Regions:
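Terminus-proximal functional modules
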Residues: 1-75
Length: 75
């Protein structure tokens, strides 16, 4: 399980709160077993689509809490 601080940072970034500023064309996430990215276009459109960096599988979430409950946080 990820720290409460990292989960809050992830939630705040996805909900447009806090001081998060994307520095690239993608936002990077991690889980216990995978790494994924969200395109900047999806982030700006509030679409929670993560693409697994090793398999190419796309994970879609409806809320930040759903994404967090699946074990994903900012990398």
């Amino acid at each position: 399980m990820w720290s409460n601080e990292l989960q809050k940072k992830t939630r705040d970034a996805l909900e447009g709160k806090g001081e998060f500023v994307p520095l690239a064309d993608a936002i990077y996430f991690k889980s216990d077993s995978s790494f994924a990215e969200m395109s900047l276009a999806d982030y700006l459109a509030n679409k929670l689509h993560l693409t697994d960096r090793s398999t190419g599988e796309i994970y879609t979430f409806h809320t930040a809490d759903e994404l967090l409950n699946a074990g994903w946080v900012l990398d």
